[in-house]
Amino acid sequence: MGRRSRAAEIQVPWQATFAPLLAGRTLPARALAAVLLLALSAACGSRLPESDFEHDDRTPPPRDSAPLRVGIIASATSPVGGSAFTGPRDGAKAWFDRLNARGGIDGRRVEVRLCDDGGSGVGNNECVHQLVEEDEVVALVATTVLDYAGASRVSGARVPDIGGQPIGSAYDTYPHLYGIYGSLAPRDGTTGWDGKQYGSTEVYRYFKREHGARTAAVVSYNQSASAAYARLVERGLRAEGYRVVTEQVDFALPNFRAVAADLKEQGADLVFDAIDGHGNARLCQAMDEVGADVTAKVTNVQNWTSTVPEAYRDSPRCRNALWATGSSRNHQDTGHPAVREFRDATKGLKTHSQWQLEGWAAARWFTDAAKSCARTGITRACVDAYMNRSEGYTAGGLLLPVEFKRLAEPPKTTRTCLSVARWQDGKGWVGQGDMNRTCFDVPQLAYEP
């Protein structure tokens, strides 16, 4: 089985609203175990007289009972929309609520400090200042923001940022930042390798191998960032041998019916896009109206939600052709104990999503790190050291194995695994095979964020 970690997604401003399908993927890492140094130092040094050990009445230091503060930054009121960035926050908060109900970490309650940065760089810096410098949080968890302008300040303060969503390039740029999918980049202050990041083609390989897809369409707006992202998707598809059909619509007055008619004419097997959620719903409706049936209308983890029936209510055929891909276990896979625990704790939420599950996994990751530090003291440095040692972390099976390793050169190929689900009315998101066995050896393609 190929283990892997995932680096930042393709980074363009539109990534927050359309499917980032040429995801940056990286291989597993193996870090030095800092605990060995501690063990060696304990075995060296001056020898004490035996009498010093005969009557040791010393008591251990009193256990700290003060709450552990963690921060969650989410662009809850961003221009993109009120719920676009709140899934990871809600999942993480649900984890901490359940954790506190069970006694917290080593008897200490976790105090969650929330901050909405409004989707702006100024707001993000204000949140970082409040949480890192004023509230003195031990760590940030499940960061999900449109503009991570304060990332360098978080890194400079050596505050571990655990399980954040790689909407920007920060998680492939700075030390002490640990994205939910991992990273192989040097993370020395320069993005990726000499300013370039790398994405791989496992999504395209999957549909070619498993479903015989040969023709893929990519739909974008006539807007620079949308078009740039579409070109990246097209490049990945061509690398996998697809015939690529490009479709562009006017951002202000999109004619989705014309696009749908051409998709039917061209015989597209797959449809990828660089458009927003509302545009996707209108595209699907147009596809149903003209009878453009496809093997898969492919979306990503951000749109892997229970709101599909409402969002695509006017397009039943296209709705049932929706497929989602990602790096975490399907949030409807209640046959898995870790998913059952997540669903039980979040049953009060109106909707469920893959981003909620990944936020839950991020909070669990922090908890595992903090528990490892309980004996010596739960500090930023100790939690950060645990994260640096992370090797194949899965959050109890919720994630594909995640690791961090600073490679001097980018890998040319990777062994990459994939979680896949498709929507079916009456069943919801139905998993397609074992994510730990749906693996491919694929090329890495360079891009500039």
Located regions from the model:
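Sec-dependent bacterial lipoprotein signal peptides
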Residues: G2-A42
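Bacterial signal peptide processing site
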Residues: C44-L48
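Extracytoplasmic "Venus flytrap"
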Residues: D52-K93, D117-V122, S220-A227, T351-L357
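Beta-alpha junction/loop-to-helix N-cap segments that form part of ligand/metal-binding clefts
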Residues: F53-D56, S83-G87, G103-H176, D250-F256
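Signal peptide-proximal N-terminal region
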Residues: D90-V112, A239-G241
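Extracytoplasmic ligand/sensor domains, especially the bilobed periplasmic-binding protein
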Residues: V137-Q248, T295-C318
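Extracellular/periplasmic periplasmic-binding protein-like sensory domains
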Residues: G182-P186, M287-A361, M435-E448
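Segments of small-molecule ligand-sensing domains
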Residues: G348-Q356, T367-V430
